[in-house]
Regions:
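Short, low-complexity, polar/charged sequence segments that are solvent-exposed and flexible
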Residues: 83-88, 118-122, 139, 155-160
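Protruding loop/beta-arch "assembly-hinge" segments enriched in small, turn-prone residues
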Residues: 135, 139-163
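Short beta-strand and beta-hairpin "edge-sheet" elements
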Residues: 29-34, 100-146
Length: 163
């Protein structure tokens, strides 16, 4: 069975205060393509015998959300507007959490999920006549926490896996 593209969901916590309940924004409206660029750091070495070996040194993932059409009704809009227009660069405005969910079986209520700290950084502001755009890039940071997520009305609830 081949999973449909909508099986991979990406949420950003727009409650950047660091306290209280997460307020998850589902990334994807008006976006036709969204991928996690894993940014694999791969080194290939060839020895004097002509043999090749590969070293995987790690990942530097990023996610480009382009286009994002500025919409004051979107929970993520105030965060993007503050960063783009006030040029803020601090953790209070840019650092938050992301949640990736894979829906492998729509009949199940809990789905594999991973939560991770991240930075949400606008790339530009402006665009063409189709509307004001603030494309942004999500930069994951630190370790991921695996678990499950239940989703109701496009709002996830994350439960970490037991250790």
């Amino acid at each position: 069975m081949k999973l449909k593209r909508e099986a991979h969901l990406l949420f950003v916590n727009t409650n950047t205060t660091g306290s209280g309940t997460a307020s998850w924004y589902l990334v994807g409206k008006h976006i036709e393509e969204l991928s996690v660029d894993l940014g694999a750091d791969v080194e290939t070495v060839k020895n004097i015998l002509g043999e090749s070996s590969v070293n995987l040194n790690g990942y530097e993932p990023s996610i480009s959300a382009d286009p994002y059409y500025a919409n004051p009704d979107d929970a993520i809009y105030p965060m993007l507007k503050a960063s783009a227009m006030d040029r803020v660069m601090d953790d209070t405005h840019c650092k938050t959490e992301m949640l990736e969910v894979i829906i492998e079986d729509t009949s199940e209520s809990a789905h594999p999920a991973w939560k991770q700290d991240c930075y949400v950084v606008p790339d530009s502001i402006g665009g063409d006549t189709s509307g004001l755009q603030i494309p942004f890039t999500i930069h994951p940071e630190g370790e991921r926490t695996a678990g499950t997520a239940t989703i109701s009305n496009k709002v996830p609830t994350f439960t970490p896996a037991s250790a």
